[in-house]
């Protein structure tokens, strides 16, 4: 069976992935699968820079607004859903295009990636849940440094699961993770967008300003009023900082500046992930040749299939 060609567009937040994905979809008869772990949630629109129907410009998109914030959409679920979508899109004669910045989710699609399918120990999990996120992450770092490198301290649920698997199996959680062999079903072209660091940070700061103008405070306030502040999906950048403001522990300007700062740090982590974990063909973003260069790479890739 021939491998399914898939275009994958990755890069840090605010670098221009969405625009490029639309261009490629129009030129190569593609359909787009979102590779963003936050855009799957309904009601998280402004804070996740979710693509609008107008921006979709008639291109079919998947894995956007598929579940409520209180219902976790895990990497394992993303892997299963995306693999099914790739096959469906390909079988209809279209080109599957994945676009996003969630490295773990995207990588899981193309590599033989396990998720620690050990059974549960609810009592142990409750015990861990009483600890603060910093203590938990430090425990993981001592027991399994490789996993600690890949799981952010703020992802408390994921850190707890890693510790639970170690507790149950006696093996590092990282052993269940990536095997660096591509899944035989797919032939991906990984395109990465990069931008001068200062220019990227300027874009991020402007994007946050625009989010506030578009109503981010109101969007976060609705989630706050619905008592969703402890839901893992809501603890993402752009929401958690405003919850601190709603609690009276910061000013609105301080919350905005913290969102900008955290977004810049997140972009740096994204770039580190993609550069260290995936074999990516990098393209300079924000220049007149960005789209043309990407299209030439896709043409060459498809011609070789």
Curated annotation (Swiss-Prot):
A Gene Ontology biological process term: tRNA modification
Catalytic reactions on record: adenosine(37) in tRNA + dimethylallyl diphosphate = N(6)-dimethylallyladenosine(37) in tRNA + diphosphate
Source species: Listeria innocua serovar 6a (strain ATCC BAA-680 / CLIP 11262)
Residues at which substrate binds: 13-18
Protein EC: 2.5.1.75
Residue(s) at site: Interaction with substrate tRNA: 102
UniProt binding sites for ATP: 11-18
UniProt-listed InterPro entries: Dimethylallyltransferase, IPT, P-loop_NTPase
Protein name: tRNA dimethylallyltransferase
PANTHER family cross-referenced by the UniProt entry: TRNA DIMETHYLALLYLTRANSFERASE
Gene3D superfamilies membership: 1.10.20.140, P-loop containing nucleotide triphosphate hydrolases
């Amino acid at each position: 069976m021939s491998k399914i060609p898939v275009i994958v567009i990755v890069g840090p937040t605010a670098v221009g992935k969405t625009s490029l994905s639309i261009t490629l979809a129009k030129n190569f008869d593609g359909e787009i699968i979102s590779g963003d772990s936050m855009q799957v949630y309904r009601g998280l629109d402004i804070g996740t820079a979710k693509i609008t129907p107008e921006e979709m410009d008639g291109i079919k998109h998947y894995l956007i607004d598929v579940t409520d914030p209180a219902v976790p959409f895990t990497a394992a679920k993303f892997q299963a859903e995306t693999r099914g979508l790739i096959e469906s899109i390909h079988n209809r004669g279209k080109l599957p295009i994945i676009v996003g910045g969630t490295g773990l989710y995207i990588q899981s699609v193309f590599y033989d990636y396990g998720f620690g399918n050990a059974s549960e120990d609810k009592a142990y999990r409750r015990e861990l849940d009483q600890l603060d996120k910093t203590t938990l992450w430090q425990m993981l770092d001592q027991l399994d440094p490789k996993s600690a490198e890949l799981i952010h301290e703020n992802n408390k649920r994921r850190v707890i699961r890693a510790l639970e698997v170690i507790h149950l199996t006696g093996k590092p959680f990282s052993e269940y993770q990536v095997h660096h062999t591509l899944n035989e079903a797919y032939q991906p072209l990984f395109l990465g967008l990069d931008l001068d660091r200062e220019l990227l940070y300027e874009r991020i700061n402007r994007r946050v300003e625009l989010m506030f103008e578009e109503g981010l405070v109101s969007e976060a306030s609705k989630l706050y009023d619905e008592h969703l502040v402890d839901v893992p999906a809501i603890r993402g950048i752009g929401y958690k900082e405003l919850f601190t403001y709603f609690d009276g522990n910061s000013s609105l300007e301080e919350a905005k500046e913290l969102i900008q700062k955290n977004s810049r740090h997140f972009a740096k982590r994204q770039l580190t992930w993609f550069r260290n974990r995936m074999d990516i063909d990098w393209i300079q973003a924000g220049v007149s040749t960005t789209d043309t260069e990407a299209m030439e790479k896709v043409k060459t890739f498809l011609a070789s299939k």
